[in-house]
Design a protein with these regions (language model features):
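Short helix-initiation/N-cap motifs at beta->coil->alpha
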Residues: 81-93, 138, 175-190
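A ligand-binding cleft/hinge motif common to bilobed small-molecule-binding domains
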Residues: 90, 106-115, 164-167, 194-226
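Ligand-binding cleft/hinge of the Venus flytrap
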Residues: 55-57, 69-79, 159-179, 207-212, ...
């Protein structure tokens, strides 16, 4: 692949995961390309969202999204990054405030988000699902079920679930927003919520942690519009870097190396996104 970057030096300071690189192509035209050309660290922003993206014991970026992102960056000659962990609801504001350079948290590509950031080509296609009480006594499978039973839905602040529930007419006082998965499960287990709204991967982990008190709803009963593509978020101005990243990710996506590394997180060939869905998702999600 003809890349924009060629790595020539790497910092030995493990805590910063710093990278030193220079551009081999034309003079940089955007902030992130300039940053790499100047030998500065690329900062990746994410929250604690296993198995998508989360920090390890030493702050290192783990999860299947980071396998894909780091694999693509490596093809661009960038092998180390600086992780920045924040709450999910602060990811887009943090990118716009220049606290990091890329959002690697595993965001769905939604029209409301596309107004604020540019997304990469998709790294996967995903279904949402509800975590419900064992036996699903309220028969909750859709947003309409939440609405019609007067159930309380808990989800993360800034999650797509909030927007989808609102669009489906679930009253705002029946949607509880909390910082993340730990708080979502706590509210559910304490009886403050009847269902948890999340993506299939994260919801499956919450069921495992419920000690047999929960199960998953049937995701096939949700409408087609609830199917979503995940993307990596970039500043609007960083178009040159995004183009190079998309090229590199396209080469890495679905490779034997990638599929071997993401398997431990539950990502399979069924999750692969297909081609060219970013514009469609921005317009239709």
């Amino acid at each position: 692949m003809k890349t924009l970057f060629k790595k020539i030096a790497t910092s030995a300071v493990a805590a910063s995961f710093a990278v030193t690189a220079f551009a081999t192509g034309p003079v940089a035209a955007d902030q992130l390309t300039d940053r790499v050309a100047a030998g500065e660290t690329i900062r990746i922003g994410f929250s604690n969202e296993p198995p998508w993206a989360y920090p390890g014991e030493n702050g290192e970026p783990l999860g299947f999204v980071h396998v894909i992102v780091l694999g693509a960056l490596e093809k661009m000659g960038i092998t180390e990054v600086e992780p920045v962990v924040t709450d999910w609801g602060g990811l887009i504001p943090g990118l716009k405030a220049d606290r990091y350079d890329i959002i690697t948290g595993g965001m769905y590509i939604l029209g409301s988000r596309c107004e604020n950031v540019n997304f990469s080509d998709p790294f996967g296609v995903f279904a949402d699902v509800f975590v419900v009480k064992k036996g699903n006594p309220k028969n909750i499978h859709t947003y309409q079920d939440i609405k019609n039973t007067g159930s309380v839905l808990v989800t993360g602040a800034g999650y797509n679930i909030v927007e989808f529930a609102r669009n489906e007419g679930v009253p705002s006082d029946k949607v509880m927003e909390v910082p993340g998965p730990t708080e979502m499960l706590a509210a559910f287990m304490a009886g403050r919520a009847d269902a948890i709204g999340s993506n299939f991967f994260a919801a499956s982990l919450l069921v495992e942690k419920s000690n047999g008190a929960a199960e998953l709803s049937d995701p096939s009963k949700l409408p087609d519009w609830a199917l979503n593509w995940g993307g990596i978020g970039f500043r609007k101005a960083d178009t040159d870097f995004l183009a190079a990243f998309n090229e590199a990710m396209g080469e890495y996506m679905g490779s034997d190396d990638m599929m071997a590394k993401v398997a431990e997180y539950g990502y399979t060939s069924d999750t692969l996104p297909g081609d060219g869905q970013t514009a469609y998702a921005c317009a239709n999600r």
